[in-house]
Amino acid sequence: MSIITFNKSTSDREDFLVNKSPYQIVPLHDRFFYKEYLDTLPNPEFDNKILIHSSFTTRPFSNKQIGNKKCNDNLKGYELIANKLRTKYILFHGPANIDDYHNFTNGLSNIDLNIKDKIICIEIPAFSKAFIDYIKQNPINNSLNNSNNQQINQSSNQPLNPYYNFICEYLNTVTSFKPVNNQFQIVLDTAHLHSNGLNGIEIIKLCNEYLNYYDFIHMNGNIKDQFKPDIHTPIDSVNDKIKFSEYVVRNIAKLNKICICETKDGDYEYYQELSEEYGYSIVDKNKLYAY
């Protein structure tokens, strides 16, 4: 049984001391890494599965940031937050454009160099238009060049959507990476996968093929058409444009994963109904969660 949870505000520090449910927090600014901010964070007496989502100002795969002092300090800052809150999980967005994609392995190495003893989660983002065009113009066949992931790519004898093939190649960069100091996982975001050219059936196929490589899913709907910048909405709601979104919700429930719903235009009751209908568990209602 998968569990539905949400983004949590950090405004009420005391909640960290009592909330043992999994959830996601999103520090939005680099100033959060100042010692004064860290001193305000409580130190819970228990370990928890809090996913610390990095801000967009930290771009560890960018030519302008990879390896420089500001980027490295930010990476270390997320480690300090994780240590204080007694969680292992830190999320960074993977490359969203061609230049960053060419830095993928170097960026992973730099993250691994600057953070210690954590579970680093690389989220597949919505790709830029130029990146989508690049994938379209450079289609790849089912990749078998990564021995650690051959079974993943051999699981279907049918020709696949070229965007699906590329996404497998993209994810294999993470799953085949050999870290020294951390564990590395992926994070699949259903809204981003829709933006990148997948329908609901292909999304579930991907979830199943990489089942052993992630603990968290971002389970979001998308009000935009494919190949457009994503805007989240509750999955399988009236405005969600993911094709076969009901199939996605029905099948993710069976994966035993932590599903973070990153929306602001829904309500707890919608997700509660989703949980009851499809067999999820759901965290208790909390005024600090965004729905």
Model-assigned labels for residue ranges:
Residues 61-69, 194-258, 264-265:
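Gly/Pro-rich active-site loop or hairpin
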Residues 20, 84-87, 117, 214, ...:
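A structural motif
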